[in-house]
């Protein structure tokens, strides 16, 4: 068994195509199969090296380790060989219509109440007509003559699927400049590389019928591939996710401070009967079951992803958290603040709260209380009971309790009205910084 993820380097990976990468990887590893990363870079006008580099970086960050790495641009000789074979068999035929002419034909068919598909006019082209067209400087694009009838398969998600080939246009597989299109290159690669299972979005269902026909023309049996088409991923309102691709690019999510396993855990379960939960990669692999994927479109819920990320960070061991922490941070600091971070990008804020400079809010009605707190602050050395002893004394002497006792201290010491436990922060800040902050708060 062998699966592949085949992105085009025409943009950054977003949660939509990352979901397909996760599905292919987990399905492969769950079944002890190989996972191939293939860069479909035949579109030289839009493809960029920096996007290819970003794809590798994003997948590595997610922990999706591939067994093989292939670029389509390195296989052009093989494609040319297959193209000539299909031309010789008559399955690829030359077409000389311009885009303007094709649009005119399409509109005429619509006006006549016919399906706007290609009319195969160029199949009737004689050798003399072709020679005259070429003599006039025209270069053909090449269409694949689809078989009659339908192509059917048993889909791992959609159950029985069928594509009526006579209801769609013969696809262009070779451009006028001689470059190959993805539709053909993908089939050649899948056959040559021993791909057995193809997991992709439901927007490829029609394409699958076409590619089965192409594969058969190249000698494959009808059931050579096993397919699984995942329903589309929509935004939380049911709209197209494409409108938010920039904000949902893996690059952006990484910069925002989301944990990679939070994303993998979420994408592994979204749109399935399994509730999302934070998992290790081994747990995600063991639990993955493609039969649990719903046939209905899934909705991407950032709130749910952030909740998963929060849980992941709250339970992240110090050793695993080190990559997010300042070099000077110790385990005590991490255990103090991890319950108050939703994103790793928030960690520097709490480091500054403890060790940096804060601007305390003005508390004119509490200045006398804060002065009293400063006057009664215990001398060092401090221990685990320092906070309790100090606040108990303040409570007894001031008559304050609850919020009226603790909130002025929190605002003075951290500049925040919520956050980690103050008894831990007090020890991390030390007496000198605590004194300075109380004085600043009194003068604010």
Curated annotation (Swiss-Prot):
Its GO CC terms are: cytosol
Motif ('KMSKS' region) spans which residues? 240-244
What are the BP-aspect GO terms? glutamyl-tRNA aminoacylation
Q: Which UniProt keywords apply?
A: Aminoacyl-tRNA synthetase, ATP-binding, Cytoplasm, Ligase, Nucleotide-binding, Protein biosynthesis
Q: Which reaction does it catalyse?
A: tRNA(Glu) + L-glutamate + ATP = L-glutamyl-tRNA(Glu) + AMP + diphosphate
Q: Which GO MF terms does the UniProt record name?
A: ATP binding; glutamate-tRNA ligase activity; tRNA binding; zinc ion binding
Per the Swiss-Prot or TrEMBL annotation, the motif 'HIGH' region is positioned at 7-17
Q: Which domain of life is it from?
A: Bacteria
Report any Pfam family annotated for this entry.
tRNA-synt_1c
Q: Which CDD domains match?
A: GluRS_core (cd00808)
Write down the EC number: 6.1.1.17
Q: Does the keyword Protease apply?
A: no
**Stated family:** Belongs to the class-I aminoacyl-tRNA synthetase family. Glutamate--tRNA ligase type 1 subfamily.
Question: Which HAMAP family does the entry link to?
Answer: Glu_tRNA_synth_type1
What name has this protein been given in UniProt?
Glutamate--tRNA ligase 2
Which organism's genome codes for this protein?
A: Gluconobacter oxydans (strain 621H)
Q: What is the lineage of its organism?
A: Bacteria, Pseudomonadati, Pseudomonadota, Alphaproteobacteria, Acetobacterales
């Amino acid at each position: 068994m062998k699966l592949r993820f085949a992105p085009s380097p025409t943009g950054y990976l977003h949660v939509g195509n990352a979901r397909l990468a996760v599905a292919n990887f987990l399905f492969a590893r769950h079944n002890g199969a190989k996972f191939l990363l293939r860069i479909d870079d035949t579109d030289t006008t839009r493809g960029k090296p920096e996007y290819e580099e970003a794809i590798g970086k994003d997948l590595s960050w997610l922990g999706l380790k591939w067994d093989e790495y292939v670029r389509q641009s390195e296989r052009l000789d093989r494609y040319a060989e297959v193209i000539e074979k299909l031309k010789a068999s008559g399955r690829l035929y030359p077409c000389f219509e311009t885009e303007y002419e094709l649009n005119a034909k399409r509109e005429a068919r619509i006006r006549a109440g016919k399906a706007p598909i290609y009319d195969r006019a160029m199949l009737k082209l004689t050798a003399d007509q072709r020679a005259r067209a070429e003599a006039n400087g025209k270069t053909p694009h090449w269409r694949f003559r689809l078989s009659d009838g339908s192509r059917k398969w048993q889909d791992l998600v959609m159950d029985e699927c069928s594509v009526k080939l006579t209801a769609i246009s013969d696809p262009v597989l070779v451009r006028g400049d001689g470059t190959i299109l993805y539709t053909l290159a993908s089939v050649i690669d899948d056959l040559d590389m021993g791909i057995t299972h193809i997991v992709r979005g439901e927007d490829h269902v029609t394409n699958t019928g076409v590619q089965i026909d192409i594969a058969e023309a190249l000698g494959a049996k009808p059931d050579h591939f096993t397919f699984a088409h995942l329903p589309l991923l929509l935004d939380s309102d049911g709209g197209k996710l494409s409108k938010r691709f920039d904000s949902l690019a893996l690059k952006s999510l990484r910069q925002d401070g989301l944990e990679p396993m939070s994303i993998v855990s979420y994408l592994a379960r979204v749109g399935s009967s399994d509730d999302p939960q934070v998992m290790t990669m081994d747990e995600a692999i063991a639990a993955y079951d493609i039969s649990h994927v719903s046939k209905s479109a899934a909705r991407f819920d950032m709130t749910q992803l952030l909740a998963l990320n929060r849980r992941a960070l709250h339970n992240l061991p110090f050793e695993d958290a080190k990559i997010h922490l300042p070099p000077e941070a110790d385990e005590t600091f991490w255990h103090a603040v991890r319950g108050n971070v939703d994103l790793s990008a928030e960690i520097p804020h709490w480091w500054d709260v403890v060790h940096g400079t804060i601007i305390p809010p003005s508390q004119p009605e509490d200045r006398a209380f804060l002065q009293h707190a400063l006057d009664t602050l215990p001398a060092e050395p401090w221990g685990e009971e320092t906070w309790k002893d100090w606040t108990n004394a303040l409570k007894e002497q001031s008559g304050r309790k609850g919020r009226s006792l603790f909130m002025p201290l929190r605002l003075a010491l951290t500049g925040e009205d919520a956050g980690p436990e103050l008894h831990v922060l007090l020890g991390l800040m030390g007496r000198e910084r605590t004194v300075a902050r109380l004085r600043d708060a009194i003068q604010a």
